Swiss-Prot record:
It comes from the Archaea. It comes from Aeropyrum pernix (strain ATCC 700893 / DSM 11879 / JCM 9820 / NBRC 100138 / K1). NCBIfam families: DNA-binding protein Alba (TIGR00285), PRK04015.1 (NF003088). This is DNA/RNA-binding protein Alba 2. Changing residue 86 to A: Moderately decreases DNA-binding. Changing residue 46 to A: No significant effect on DNA binding. Changing residue 42 to A: Decreases DNA-binding. DNA binds at residues 10, 13, 40, 42-43, 46, 86. Binds double-stranded DNA tightly but without sequence specificity. Involved in DNA compaction.
Length: 102
């Protein structure tokens, strides 16, 4: 991936603007040119929303350098005690300040 070793922002269930602030803080205050936004399952749409808000409203010099998608098979227990296999999708979005390659 293009963002090897870059700081990560993991997306969860909090409001989108919390993650927008986390992405901006990571890019502006930690002295890094790149950040990786990661999400799994139902939080993928929240990750995409956060990245687009950062790019279109706050920091127009941010570019999407790479996007990696994947899915994993996870075994879960049902309430009846049976084991089921579920697929969980994941996404990693690498962001970089334009013109400042690492």
């Amino acid at each position: 991936m293009a963002c090897e070793g870059a700081p990560e922002v993991r997306i969860g269930r909090k409001p989108v603007m919390n993650y927008v602030l986390a992405i901006l803080t990571t890019l502006m205050e930690q002295g890094t040119n790149q950040v990786v936004v990661k999400a799994r399952g139902r939080n993928i749409n929240r990750a995409v929303d956060a990245v687009e808000i950062v790019r279109k409203r706050f920091a127009k010099n941010i570019e999407i350098k790479d996007i990696k998608i994947d899915s994993q098979e996870i075994e879960v227990q049902t309430p009846e005690g049976q084991t089921r296999t579920r697929r969980v999708s994941s996404i990693e979005i690498c962001l970089e300040k334009a013109g400042e390659s690492a």
